[in-house]
């Protein structure tokens, strides 16, 4: 069996420690050697980003320059269309073949809205889901049929993610950082410090570009 590949999608507007540090901890917990970050171009489930795709890509490059765990995949940025996870995972599965273990990392908040995602039922055909737990969010889905779906796919053993190519959901005990891109944008607009919220090269770039003002 080939090594588990993990993908981490998002808007990253801007990228911050709340994105990076839980995934770094996750990698240590379950034995990931590489996490591929996939920034959205046009996110279908949330407001459109304030920074353009070139700026968000550059901020990610700055944030991961000294972090060999991470690599960047630009495929969604190159689509002039909504960024659907189901479509991206189908592409990855076709490229990697049927036997490579593949996982998609999401937050617990995203799990609760997962049944609203485009072709959500196909996602576990192509990948596992790794859910980074977040305090304040329930562990149960809102509707019984979705709770049953969760329980049918749930595993408490991260080794299952390495031994099977797709189909499992794993709830990871990762640290929670009370940081969000919304908070960072608001602080920047108010002229407040964000030194401890995101990597210094990213903050320098934001200031140079006059972003989020």
UniProtKB/Swiss-Prot annotation:
Name listed for the protein in its UniProt record: Probable nicotinate-nucleotide adenylyltransferase
Enzyme class: transferase
Gene3D superfamilies: HUPs
GO molecular function, one term: ATP binding
Organism ancestry: Bacteria, Pseudomonadati, Pseudomonadota, Gammaproteobacteria, Enterobacterales
Catalytic activity: nicotinate beta-D-ribonucleotide + ATP + H(+) = deamido-NAD(+) + diphosphate
Name of encoding gene: nadD
InterPro entries: Cyt_trans-like, NadD/NMNAT, Rossmann-like_a/b/a_fold
EC number in record: 2.7.7.18
């Amino acid at each position: 069996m080939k090594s588990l590949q993990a993908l981490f999608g998002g808007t990253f507007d801007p990228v911050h420690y709340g994105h990076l540090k839980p995934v770094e901890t996750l990698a240590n917990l379950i034995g990931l050697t590489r996490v591929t970050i996939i920034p959205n171009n046009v996110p279908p489930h949330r407001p459109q980003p304030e920074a353009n795709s070139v700026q968000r890509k550059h901020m990610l490059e700055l944030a991961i320059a000294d972090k060999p765990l991470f690599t960047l995949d630009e495929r969604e940025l190159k689509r002039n269309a909504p960024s659907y996870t189901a479509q991206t995972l189908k592409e990855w599965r076709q490229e990697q073949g049927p036997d490579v273990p593949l996982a998609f990392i999401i937050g617990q908040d995203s799990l609760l809205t997962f049944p609203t995602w485009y072709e959500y039922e196909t996602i576990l055909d192509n990948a596992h889901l790794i859910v980074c737990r977040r305090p304040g969010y329930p562990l149960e889905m809102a509707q019984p049929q979705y709770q049953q779906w969760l329980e049918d796919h749930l595993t408490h053993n991260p080794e299952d993610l390495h031994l099977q190519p797709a189909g499992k959901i794993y709830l990871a005990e990762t640290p929670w950082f009370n940081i969000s891109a919304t908070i960072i944008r608001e602080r920047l607009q108010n002229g407040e410090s964000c030194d401890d919220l995101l990597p210094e090269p990213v903050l320098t770039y934001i200031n140079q570009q006059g972003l989020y003002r």
